[in-house]
């Protein structure tokens, strides 16, 4: 259970970091 919780936290962190990046990336590709 502890490992799964840790994985969720890591995933959420990665999401927070990568979401703006991928958003900006898709905007760039539309230019």
From Swiss-Prot:
It is found in: Secreted, Extracellular space. Keywords: Copper, Oxygen transport, Secreted, Transport. One of its GO terms (molecular function) is oxygen carrier activity. The keyword Magnesium does not apply. Hemolymph. GO terms for cellular component: extracellular region. Belongs to the tyrosinase family. Hemocyanin subfamily. Hemocyanins are copper-containing oxygen carriers occurring freely dissolved in the hemolymph of many mollusks and arthropods. This is Hemocyanin subunit 2. It comes from Maja squinado (Mediterranean spider crab).
């Amino acid at each position: 259970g502890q490992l799964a919780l840790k994985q969720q936290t890591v995933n959420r962190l990665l999401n927070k970091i990568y979401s703006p990046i991928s958003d900006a990336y898709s905007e760039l590709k539309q230019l």
